[in-house]
């Protein structure tokens, strides 16, 4: 009897590993249900589960989720409204929840309102201040103070010649003042500044180290002004500033009104070549470039005085050439 009772326990113990390793176990099917719903292609809130996935543990999971969705959510939930777009980026700003009429007052919205008011209050205070907000953020207001052009005397207080100038005075921009050279090098400096434009007039100081130069155009005067601080002759540093001496400008204007024909004659020409009156045409020794074209299209034909010798083509000349080899 004891041996008969022990025999059936052997196969019972041996059958346990076969039951644990059986491929027909429903556990892999239960584990498959724990994957996220968006990976399985299921809807966010399915009404009825699929027939093949119904089992005991899966029903328990659904029963555990249902109380959370039913009882734990507020009457107008905010999060489930965007449940269908959980994988997409946000489509509204964080400030839209405050002004949207469909959403109720939540602790999140009540917590955001004082923060936004604090953030906006400094900006409102800055913009409400008269003059400060516009001058900081308006490009047009930045250039408004610069519309009033200051005279050179106001820009540089060390100018003593500009004491008689007022803000209504209009100075000629074609005049420049060159200074910083010795008296012996005045002609050399004048010759150097003649390379930057046509000098109409120059007024040199008898005792000082400056001279006033008037150019033909304002562009030439600006080119001369760009040479401020340049060293000439490796020992002379020259300064160039806009001329503010009204007496020099007025005297040149009076001379131009009295003799208009001489106003356009550059005085710099008197250094090398003599000046000619404006009515007399200038005679140039250079050969015109159109001379060769005019010669080719001339109506006249050149005829030589004597006849050019030609070869005799007669029969006698051919016979003599054949016989004697001429």
UniProtKB/Swiss-Prot annotation:
Signal peptide interval: none
Gene name, Swiss-Prot/TrEMBL: NUP35
Name the record gives this protein: Nucleoporin NUP35
Modified residues (Phosphoserine): 53, 55, 66, 73, 99-100, 121, 138, 252, 259, 279, 284
InterPro entries according to UniProt: Nucleoporin_NUP53, Nucleotide-bd_a/b_plait_sf, RBD_domain_sf, RRM_NUP35_dom
Gene Ontology CC annotation, any one: nuclear pore nuclear basket
Cysteine pairings via disulfide bonds: none
UniProt KW keywords: Membrane, mRNA transport, Nuclear pore complex, Nucleus, Phosphoprotein, Protein transport, Translocation, Transport
Subunit structure: Interacts with TMEM48/NDC1. Forms a complex with NUP93, NUP155, NUP205 and lamin B; the interaction with NUP93 is direct.
Pfam family, one: RRM_Nup35
Residues modified to Phosphothreonine: 106, 129, 265, 273, 275, 280, 308
Principal subcellular localization: nucleus
Its biological purpose: Functions as a component of the nuclear pore complex (NPC). NPC components, collectively referred to as nucleoporins (NUPs), can play the role of both NPC structural components and of docking or interaction partners for transiently associated nuclear transport factors. May play a role in the association of MAD1 with the NPC.
Family: Belongs to the Nup35 family.
Region span, Disordered: 1-33, 71-92
Species in which this protein is naturally found: Homo sapiens (Human)
Subcellular location: Nucleus, Nuclear pore complex; Nucleus membrane
Membrane topology type: Peripheral membrane protein
Record bears the keyword Phosphoprotein: yes
Listed GO MF terms: identical protein binding; nucleic acid binding; phospholipid binding; structural constituent of nuclear pore
Origin organism lineage: Eukaryota, Metazoa, Chordata, Craniata, Vertebrata
GO biological process: cellular response to leukemia inhibitory factor; mRNA transport; NLS-bearing protein import into nucleus; nuclear pore organization; nucleocytoplasmic transport
Residues covered by the RRM Nup35-type domain: 170-250
């Amino acid at each position: 009897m004891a041996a008969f009772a022990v025999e059936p326990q052997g196969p019972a113990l041996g059958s346990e590993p076969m039951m644990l390793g059986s491929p027909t176990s429903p556990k892999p099917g239960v584990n498959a249900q724990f994957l996220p719903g968006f990976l399985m292609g299921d809807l966010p809130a399915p009404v009825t589960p699929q027939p093949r996935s119904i089992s005991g543990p899966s029903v328990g999971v659904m029963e555990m989720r249902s109380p959370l969705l039913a009882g734990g959510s507020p009457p107008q939930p905010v999060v489930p409204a965007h449940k269908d777009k959980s994988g997409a980026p946000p489509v509204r700003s964080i400030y839209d929840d405050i002004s949207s009429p469909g959403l109720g007052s939540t602790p999140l919205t009540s917590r955001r309102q004082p923060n936004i008011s604090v953030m906006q209050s400094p900006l409102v205070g800055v913009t409400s201040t008269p003059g400060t907000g516009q001058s900081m953020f308006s490009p047009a207001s930045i250039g408004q103070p610069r519309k009033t052009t200051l005279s050179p005397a106001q820009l540089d207080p060390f100018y003593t010649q500009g004491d008689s100038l007022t803000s209504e005075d209009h100075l000629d921009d074609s005049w420049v003042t060159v200074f910083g050279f010795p008296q012996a090098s005045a002609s050399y400096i004048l010759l150097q500044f003649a390379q930057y434009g046509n000098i109409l007039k120059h007024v040199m100081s008898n005792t000082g180290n400056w001279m006033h130069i008037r150019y033909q155009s304002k562009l030439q005067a600006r080119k001369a002004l760009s040479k401020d601080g340049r060293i000439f002759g490796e020992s002379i540093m020259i300064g160039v500033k806009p001329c503010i001496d009204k007496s020099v400008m007025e005297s040149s204007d009076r001379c131009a009104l009295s003799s208009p024909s001489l106003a356009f004659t550059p005085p710099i020409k008197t250094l090398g070549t003599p000046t000619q009156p404006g009515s007399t045409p200038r005679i140039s020794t250079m050969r015109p470039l159109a001379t060769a074209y005019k010669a080719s299209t001339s109506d006249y034909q050149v005829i030589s005085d004597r006849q050019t010798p030609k070869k005799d083509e007669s029969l006698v000349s051919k016979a003599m050439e054949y016989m004697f080899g001429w």
